């Protein structure tokens, strides 16, 4: 039955549009960053920038086997021009329809991006390739991350940051504190709410107006964690910021992810109504905001 369904070219869009009732999907085509999957009527791209963090050396490939040169062409070999080149690509992708930037470096490194000087960051371009150290690479990547935060603010593009799961060491949300604090005009979307280190999320959303908690993937990872985050964010009056996404590959997974989140959200709201914390009208308003209004306001 599954095989038969997949033979129908209309199956995928039917599930997404008619079963999931999606009106717009923010898509991350990391194998071809910034693409709308050829379906602009439903998919709106986020532009993943991870490849640009490989620009300290020619010929590098990421863990998916994709190279910076193959996707974006030859790049400058000095820091000021390189940063400007990255900005040019971001502007180009925004003009082509991208509504957000995304960084998922937590799969490759920690999320503590110290602020470094241009002199420290450009050393990676000055030394022989054989002499490049891990410290040189880190300085370059840290510098670029801060510049991207500035560009995101300048171009009014939310910056989605994968947090939590990945290479695990120091990928919790608090590692981003210095960057978020120093870039108040940049909208930071904290994907996955830092799971499993959820407690980091709450002081950040309470302390910074430019932080947006996104429960993408969380209900699939842990129904209990999803419930807990929703309970606490509602009690902290963060209702206007909460977003959700499926973070899946297949339409079956997307539908299942939606069911999981609906179940979690309804469970939490039912408990809040029974406790007298919310009215039914309040709960309906929260549903509209989390499943539609907040994302529309943030991205579109």
Outline where the language-model segments fall:
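Family-specific functional microsites
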Residues: 252
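Short hydrophobic/aromatic-enriched beta-strand-loop microsegments
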Residues: 45, 211-216
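Active-site beta-loop-alpha junctions enriched in small/polar residues
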Residues: 30, 48-54, 104-108, 164-166, ...
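Histidine/acidic residue-rich metal-binding segments in metalloenzymes
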Residues: 78-103, 110-211, 225-243, 260-261, ...
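Mid-domain alpha/beta scaffold segments of enzyme catalytic cores
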Residues: 1-143, 151
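Mid-to-C-terminal alpha-helical segments outside catalytic/metal-binding sites
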Residues: 3, 239-240, 255-300
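A generic structural motif
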Residues: 215-219, 244-246, 278-285
């Amino acid at each position: 039955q599954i095989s038969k369904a997949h033979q129908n070219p209309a199956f995928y869009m039917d599930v997404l549009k008619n079963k999931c009732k999606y009106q717009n999907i923010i898509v991350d085509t990391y194998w071809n960053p910034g693409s709308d999957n050829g379906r602009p009527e439903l998919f709106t791209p986020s532009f993943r920038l991870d490849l640009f963090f490989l620009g300290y050396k020619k010929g590098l490939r990421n863990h998916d086997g994709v190279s910076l040169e193959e996707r974006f062409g030859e790049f400058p070999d000095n820091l000021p021009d390189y940063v400007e080149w990255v900005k040019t690509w971001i502007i180009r992708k925004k003009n082509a329809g991208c509504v957000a930037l995304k960084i998922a470096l937590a799969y490759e490194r920690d999320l503590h991006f110290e602020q470094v000087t241009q002199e420290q960051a450009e050393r990676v371009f000055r030394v022989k390739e054989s002499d490049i150290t891990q410290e040189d690479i880190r300085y370059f990547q840290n510098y670029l991350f801060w510049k991207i935060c500035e560009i995101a603010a300048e171009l009014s593009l939310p910056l989605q940051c994968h947090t939590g799961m990945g290479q695990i060491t120091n990928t919790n949300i608090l590692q981003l504190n210095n960057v978020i604090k120093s870039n108040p005009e940049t909208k930071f979307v904290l994907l996955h709410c830092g799971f499993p280190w959820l407690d980091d999320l709450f002081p950040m959303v309470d302390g910074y107006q430019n932080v947006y908690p996104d429960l993408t993937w969380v209900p699939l990872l842990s129904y209990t964690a999803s419930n807990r985050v929703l309970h606490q964010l509602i009690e902290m009056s963060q209702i206007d910021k909460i977003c959700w996404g499926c973070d899946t590959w297949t339409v079956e997974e997307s539908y299942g992810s939606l069911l999981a989140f609906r179940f979690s959200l309804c469970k939490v709201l039912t408990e809040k109504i029974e406790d007298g914390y919310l009215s039914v009208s309040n709960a309906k308003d929260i549903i509209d905001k989390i499943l539609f209004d907040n994302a529309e306001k943030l991205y579109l």
